[in-house]
């Protein structure tokens, strides 16, 4: 279906001829730096990270209350010090390109926290090189705490190799390979504590990001990404969970979602689709990729991405395809011939490395792309079969062109894309009643932003005619 461009709002000389829509939006030139970074991801390094984290014996958040453990080089305090030292080592290798910090606080007694407990999130910031683009932040995280059968047992062995040394290894490996490059936007590499106690670490960090006014455009949470070696596992798939209706939506926003059928177009859902499109582009062999799951998380479970959702940020969760619950949240033991415990030997390090590559590719794509267009609007002032969409330029000033994407309302992914050039309006010969549209920005190298679904510009109601006062009636 062709698109006709309204050029009245375009930049001088910006005109694009009509041409047919293109199926599969992922067909674009590969960024050689991203390709190089993905080749640098090492299963051996991932394995070393997981083994080191397991060596601390327990990383239960409550082990912070046992000073003897820290003296022995065990427990969560020793673990977080080691994670910080790794970030600092990467920073030294890139001549100080990473800013390494603790987000430290005392968690008051509450659910699964029987006494005041010192928590610390560890993070490293790779600042963007463009003054405006650097305001846009993309974050990868995993939780480094662990637990045995009881979440309040801070003494027993809690190896947590899969849950979640694997996700922490993804965050660290992304930091190691991506810190060798420069990006216009900012990337944060994070490891959080307190997840097993009730998402306390991520909740504190997300709240801090909100209070500081960070423009956090996407959060990639990796939790249980070890590809545990068990019957029924599929090493070619990682699940990506995303919320549909935003938990932070206001009543007015919910009313709009109901009116336009926008239940599957939250910002988190757009991030999930972006991950999928990135996989098609950079993991094109087809031997590994994401399976999009359109719900916030699994049944009876929760994750750190939801802490960011609750603060209004787009966030998704990566999790292995099939979980083995004998190797999660279990005291290490053997019963009736069954080996329980989250042990290193059950982790598939090639699988974790693939998850790290997918995360790294997504982060690098996002941090290289121009910011998404703003004020994206669909004109709905009269009944018509054409669709008019308008938008304002990407705020970082780096976009050189825009694309309109669309899909049937029942389709999970964007199916069509049309280049419309450096314009601010497009008139599409396709009814808005039948499809979902999005607009995204791209730069000269073909890096594409997250798409933005247009909001309707509703018809202005005609005010009722004034009723004459009784004395004026004739």
Regions inferred by a protein language model and the residue ranges of each:
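Extracellular fibronectin type III
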Residues: 442-473
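Alpha-helical metal-binding/catalytic segments enriched in His/Glu/Asp
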Residues: 124, 140-199, 359
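Conserved aromatic anchor
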Residues: 385-398
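Active-site-adjacent mobile loop/cap segments within catalytic or ligand-binding domains
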Residues: 54, 225-246, 292-370
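A non-catalytic alpha/beta surface segment that caps or lines the substrate-entry region
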Residues: 23, 45-127
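Beta-strand-rich modules
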Residues: 427-449
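Short beta-strand segments within Ig-like beta-sandwich modules, predominantly Fibronectin type-III
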Residues: 416-423
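Metal-dependent peptidase/peptidase-like ectodomains
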Residues: 192-303, 311, 315
């Amino acid at each position: 279906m062709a698109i006709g461009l309204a050029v009245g709002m375009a930049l001088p000389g910006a005109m694009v001829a009509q041409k047919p829509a293109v199926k599969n939006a992922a067909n674009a030139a590969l960024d050689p730096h991203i390709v190089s970074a993905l080749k640098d991801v090492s299963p051996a390094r991932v394995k070393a990270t997981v083994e080191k984290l397991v060596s601390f014996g327990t990383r239960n958040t409550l082990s912070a209350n046992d000073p003897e453990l820290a003296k022995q080089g065990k427990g969560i305090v020793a673990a977080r010090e080691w994670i910080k030292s790794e970030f600092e080592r990467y920073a030294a290798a890139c001549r100080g390109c990473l800013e390494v910090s603790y987000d430290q606080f005392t968690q008051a007694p509450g659910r699964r926290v029987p006494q005041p407990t010192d928590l610390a999130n560890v993070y490293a910031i790779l600042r963007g090189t463009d003054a405006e683009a650097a305001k846009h932040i993309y974050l990868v995280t995993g939780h480094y705490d662990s637990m045995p059968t009881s979440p309040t047992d801070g003494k027993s062995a809690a190896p947590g190799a899969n849950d979640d040394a694997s996700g922490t290894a993804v965050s660290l490996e992304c930091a190691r390979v991506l810190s060798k490059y420069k990006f216009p936007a900012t990337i944060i590499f994070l490891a959080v504590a307190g997840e097993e106690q009730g998402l306390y670490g991520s909740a504190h960090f997300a709240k801090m990001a909100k209070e500081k006014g960070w423009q956090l455009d996407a959060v990639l949470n990796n939790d249980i990404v070890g590809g545990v070696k068990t019957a029924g596992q599929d090493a070619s798939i990682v699940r990506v969970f995303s919320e549909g209706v935003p938990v932070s939506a206001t009543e007015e926003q919910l009313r709009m979602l109901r009116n336009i059928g926008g239940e599957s177009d939250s910002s988190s859902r757009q991030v999930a689709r972006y991950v999928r499109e990135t996989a098609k582009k950079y993991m094109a062999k087809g031997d590994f990729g994401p399976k999009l799951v359109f719900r916030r998380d699994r049944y009876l479970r929760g994750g750190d991405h939801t802490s960011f959702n609750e603060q209004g940020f787009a966030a998704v969760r990566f999790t292995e395809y099939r979980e083995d619950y004998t190797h999660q949240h279990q005291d290490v033991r053997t019963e009736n011939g069954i080996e329980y415990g989250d042990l290193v030997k059950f982790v598939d390090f090639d699988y974790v490395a693939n998850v790290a590559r997918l995360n790294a590719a997504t982060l690098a794509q996002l941090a290289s792309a121009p910011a998404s267009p703003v004020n994206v609007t669909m004109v709905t002032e009269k009944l018509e079969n054409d669709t008019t969409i308008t938008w304002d330029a990407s705020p970082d000033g780096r976009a050189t062109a825009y694309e309109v994407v669309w899909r049937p309302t029942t389709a999970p992914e964007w199916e069509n894309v049309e280049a419309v050039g450096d314009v601010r309006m497009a008139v599409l010969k396709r009814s808005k009643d039948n499809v979902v549209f999005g607009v995204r920005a791209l730069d000269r190298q073909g890096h594409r932003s997250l798409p933005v679904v247009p909001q309707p510009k509703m018809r202005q109601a005609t005010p009722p005619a004034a009723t004459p006062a009784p004395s004026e009636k004739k």
